[in-house]
């Protein structure tokens, strides 16, 4: 009977750990750059669930990590929601009318993009 109880408790512990690990989300904090053959410029900075945009119609956005969306706001635009993706230092989103990849400063993807477009 003790063995069965121990096995059940161990199983519950493992399930709890797996569930908690899957809910853990990677921090998005940092500076994101738009890097292409024409430009290498700071696009926006994320701190927590908020971001400030350097250039463009929108001034800022709020991040909803559960839905993978952002809510763009600003004086020159009507608020709108856009889906985003984030993987390996690349934040892909439409903040200017066209979806672009933005690179987290000092990430491997950032350094690779700098090399690809001849900035390093």
Descriptions of predicted regions:
Residues 19-33, 45-47:
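N-terminal helix-cap/turn-to-beta initiation motif at the start of protein domains
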Residues 35-79:
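N-terminal glycine/threonine-rich, aromatic-flanked beta-hairpin/loop signature
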Residues 60-67, 96-120:
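Edge beta-strand at a domain terminus
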Residues 76-108:
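Structured, soluble extracytoplasmic/luminal domains of envelope-associated proteins
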Residues 50-55, 92-95, 111-113:
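Short, well-ordered strand-loop elements centered on a beta-strand within folded domains, enriched
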Residues 4, 23-25, 88:
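N-terminal cationic leader/targeting segments used for protein routing and processing
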Residues 1-20:
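Sec-dependent bacterial lipoprotein signal peptides
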